[in-house]
Amino acid sequence: MVETLEKTPVTATVEVPVKQERDTVKKVLIICSKGTLEDVYAALIMANGALMDGRDAKLFFTFFGLNAITKKNADHLHTATVGNPAFMPAMPTLVAGLPGFEAFASYMMKKEMDKLDIPPVTEFFQMIDAAGGEIYACKLAAEMFKLNKEDFLDEVKDIITVGDMYALADGDGSHLIFI
């Protein structure tokens, strides 16, 4: 014989906590280790967004990310086409590796960003600096690539160690973002 259970309504009162503070994120430290156009812009856009939202933003560039903050390369970054699975997925790697294709892809990307009124890299750094953001270069990577303070954009505040970088991130409400 099968027993049946009576259905009884279940009611419960659940208190939902009300957020007293606007946000717990007070500052961001964005570490950029890559020097491709899309990675550098991701870091710049996130830092700018944090600053516009009233948060502190600091950028730390290391290894190939240093290309983004050198006077020589800042406005000449490229989009990686070979080995980038997100770049036109249906395109064979052979086509993406053809001479001139990376330059063409970078040109098209910059053209689309220009349509959206996204500033060039050096102008973006100037905006971030003017809004109170701070830009740093990694000491070890700078030494490895034989770069000096004079090689970097004027907006680069200093060349610092990894320990110094962690000190920048110290405190409650601090978030590290690695690109």
Q: Where do the protein language model's features map onto the residues?
A:
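N-terminal beta-loop-helix "entrance" segment that forms/cooperates
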Residues: 65-78
